[in-house]
Structures are given as C-alpha cells and as structure tokens.
C-alpha cells in the first residue's frame, strides 16, 4: 500500500476513537527497526505509524536533518509498497520551526508533533498555533499534534526534570486556541527507561480531559508519550479514555541492542581473538593463525535477528493496544 498522508491518518484516529483501540507510534532510530516494524504490523493486519525525531533525521542525513528526512521518506515509501497496510510517518518532538516549515513543504510527513510544552502556557499556545497556521497556509493535510503538560525524562535531547500533569480545563482552552488535531497529555508516564510499577499513572485524569473536551464539542484524539515502561494492563486502562496514539521508542532501542548483543555473545571467538592472539585489526589478522568468521560478523546476520525481534515486539504491542486486525487499508 502507499505511504499515506494526514487525511487518511485522520480516518484511522476516528476509527480508533470509535472502536477503543490505540495506534502504536513507533520511532525509527535505525532502518532495521523500520523493517521489523513493517513486518510486525503487516503480520497483525494493523496500520503502522512510524515516527522520526529531529535527532533521527540528523543521524540519517549525516548531520543534515532535511537530507535525512528525504532519504528516509523515500525509503519508507518504497518499502511500504510491499505491504497491505496503511503506513504513516509522524515527526516526533519537533521544536525547530524552520525545520517544521521544510517538512510541510516537502510533503513527506503524515503528521507533525510540535513540542512547546516546556514553554509557559501562552507561549505554548502561540507556537503551536503558528505551526497549525503553517499547514493551513500551505493547503496541506498534515495533522498537527501538540503537547500540554510536561512529561519527565529525556527524549531526543529534550530533558524535563519534573512532570506537570495536564489540567482538563486548560486542555480545552489549548485545543480551542491552537486548532491542534491531536493532544499529547501528561498523566504520569515518563520518557526513557521507566518501570510501570513506579509510575503514578492517572487514567482518571485522562478521562477528565477527554470528557472536558467532549463537553466543549472537541472530539480530539489524545496521545500518550513515554509509554515504554507502561505495562499491558496499565495501557489498556488508559485506552478506555480517549488515548488513541501510544508512543514507543526506548523499548525498540533496547531490543535492537540486546538482540545484537545476544547474537555476538553466542560466538565471541568468531569476532574477537582468543586470549594469546594479537588483536591485529590494522592488518586484518594477516600474521596470526586466527581469523574472524564472516558468517558471524557480517552485520546482516545480526540485522536479520533485529528485524525479527522488532517484528515480534511490535506484533505483541498491536494486540495489547487493540490495533491488530483493524487496518483500514487491507
């Protein structure tokens, strides 16, 4: 299926709100993660929302975020054609307005998340509204996600030492003034490595925010950031209250590295010289009796394991979130 835009993504969110499921928004720090995500989503008949941060774009573009976005956009579009699901791209935690304007002009993302949550309320409103107006001026169908409240932890070099819960009435004012299509709320999750048992999650607050918005005629999809440590039962409880986009990044990063670590530790002497053999990498071990084993160190060997593991993890997450079997583009 094609790599879709904001208009089609909006229909997925409408369905998610109606049916009570969540779309797992999955960050791609590296291409093998993307490949695994596509395989896992297709296996479970779930539409797929990929995400890229500014840091991921710079990494893909060797320091040039625009080049990285173009390269990954082409890659996603080409690979997405092989699968019978809808594939979308959200730009996660964007703070650079110039880069956001370039994203809109390139017409690559399906949606963009403007993160001005660290600013005072009025400045957050003004910045978020400015991005919405960029989309309107361009005649684009890109959806805009904005954040109100602050989530503790570090995400793509954005650090918050404290968490500030989202106020329901302020949420109504924020959505009304900004025109944001989606609202990311702070209800006790945490960016980075966090344990669900240690999180003070507030499904009651998510419910209050959802109800306050609906009371004012705003059927705005809610977004849960910092969910890698949230346990299945906790997530399913949150999904009952208007959450229909659930961000995952840290979990995939860990699974990527752990899978490679496990693979290489199965046969360490095929990669690293055993004790007593000189570590003569500069001559590629020409003068030693030992040689590395290409069948083990070929990066595609670990890469295939990584793709398979990411696919399995994402497939499990679609079952937990309820998006399995819900693709609108099958």
Swiss-Prot record:
Its cofactor is Zn(2+). InterPro entries: Aldolase_TIM (IPR013785), Class_II_FBP_aldolase (IPR050246), FBA_II (IPR000771), Fbpase2 (IPR054909). GO terms for biological process: glycolytic process. Its EC number is 4.1.2.13. Zn(2+) 2 binds at residues 115, 145. Pathway: Carbohydrate degradation; glycolysis; D-glyceraldehyde 3-phosphate and glycerone phosphate from D-glucose: step 4/4. Binds 2 Zn(2+) ions per subunit. One is catalytic and the other provides a structural contribution. This is Fructose-bisphosphate aldolase class 2. It comes from Haloferax volcanii (strain ATCC 29605 / DSM 3757 / JCM 8879 / NBRC 14742 / NCIMB 2012 / VKM B-1768 / DS2) (Halobacterium volcanii). The gene is fba.
């Amino acid at each position: 299926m094609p790599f879709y835009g904001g208009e089609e993504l909006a229909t997925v969110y409408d369905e998610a709100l109606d049916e009570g499921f969540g779309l797992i928004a999955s960050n791609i720090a590296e291409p093998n993660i993307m490949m695994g995500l596509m395989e896992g989503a297709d296996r479970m008949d779930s539409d797929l929302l990929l995400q890229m941060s500014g840091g991921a774009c710079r990494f893909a573009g060797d320091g040039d975020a625009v080049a990285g976005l173009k390269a990954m956009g082409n890659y996603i579009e080409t690979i997405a054609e092989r699968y019978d699901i809808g594939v979308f791209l959200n730009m996660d935690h964007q703070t650079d307005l110039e880069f956001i304007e370039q994203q809109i002009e390139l017409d690559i993302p399906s949606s963009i998340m403007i993160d001005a949550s660290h600013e005072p309320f009025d400045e957050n409103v003004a910045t978020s509204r400015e991005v919405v107006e960029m989309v309107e001026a361009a005649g684009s169908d890109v959806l805009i996600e904005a954040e109100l409240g602050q989530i503790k932890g570090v995400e793509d070099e954005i650090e918050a030492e404290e968490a500030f819960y989202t106020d329901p009435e302020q949420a109504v004012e924020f959505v009304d003034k900004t025109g944001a299509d989606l609202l990311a709320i702070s209800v006790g999750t945490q960016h980075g490595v966090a344990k669900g048992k240690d999180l003070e999650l507030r499904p009651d607050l998510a419910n209050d925010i959802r109800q306050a918005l609906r009371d004012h005629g705003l059927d705005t999809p809610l977004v849960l950031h910092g969910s890698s440590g949230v346990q299945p039962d906790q997530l399913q409880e949150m999904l009952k209250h208007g959450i229909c986009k659930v961000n995952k990044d840290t979990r995939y990063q860990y699974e990527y590295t752990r899978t490679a670590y496990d693979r290489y530790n199965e046969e360490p002497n095929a990669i690293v010289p055993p004790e007593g053999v000189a570590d003569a990498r500069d001559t590629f071990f020409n003068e030693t009796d030992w040689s590395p084993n290409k069948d083990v160190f070929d990066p595609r060997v670990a890469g295939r394991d990584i793709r398979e593991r990411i696919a399995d993890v994402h497939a499990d997450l679609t079952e937990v979130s309820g998006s399995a079997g819900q693709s609108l583009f099958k």
